[in-house]
Amino acid sequence: LMTVFWLFLGKVAKVPTGPLPYALFVFTGLVPWFLFSTTVGAAANSLLDSERLISKVYFPRLAVPFAAAGPALVDFAVSTALLVAMMAAHGVAPGATLLLAPLAVALIMLVALGVGTFLAALNVAYRDFRYVVPFLIQAWLFATPSIYLATSGSGADLPDAVRWVMAANPMTGLIDFFRAALFGLDLPWASLGVAAGVGGLLFLLGCVYFRRVEDSFADVI
């Protein structure tokens, strides 16, 4: 996927990426994005994948979507190692702000678990909805400036409607913060604050909805 973006957006469309080579720019956006999307996808399907266990054994059901984050974190660790190798190949050293990158990672997991938990409960009641989830995640990717800057090619601001969508999207601030922390760029603290607020709300809503319908899982499954 990164090769496709690099070829068409980096070489053909020549999407501006600021001071970073496009390959590094897009990879530092896709690494945290795949952490998010993999966690959401796994959590969303976790209850249906564990239906036999849920119907026979009682345990806190919320543990099921939360446990789905484990493999995603392993993949993230491997991808981060590849990212470090790519930075070394480009002669780019991480900034001192690298130590702040885990803050963005933690908030990404907060958002992902909130969304994934909500979708997991929804999938139990509406099983066909699981086939819609990948398309929603794909649409969310293109609403997030992970593979492009949040400006047009001329540097002018994007239309107001687009900017509002990006501002309300918690992944916008989190990916921007992750990238800035990695390369020692100016840290977008305001965007991080908005992302933390929206992410915390999504996590709360996801858990509340899950707990409200949790008692019906064994009957439905």
Region spans (language model):
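Transmembrane helix-loop-helix hairpins at lipid-water interfaces of multipass membrane proteins
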Residues: 1-22, 163, 176, 180-183
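Alpha-helical transmembrane segments and their short interhelical loops
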Residues: 3-16, 61, 66-136, 185-210
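Long, hydrophobic alpha-helical segments
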Residues: 25-38
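Transmembrane helix boundary and interhelical loop/hinge segments in multi-pass membrane proteins
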Residues: 36-62, 66-73
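A cytosolic-side transmembrane-helix exit/cap motif
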Residues: 42-48, 118-125, 151-155
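Faces of alpha-helical transmembrane segments in polytopic inner-membrane proteins
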Residues: 75, 138-145
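Short cytosolic juxtamembrane segments of multi-pass membrane proteins
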Residues: 128, 211-221
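Short hydrophobic, aromatic-rich alpha-helical segments embedded in or entering the lipid bilayer
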Residues: 142-193
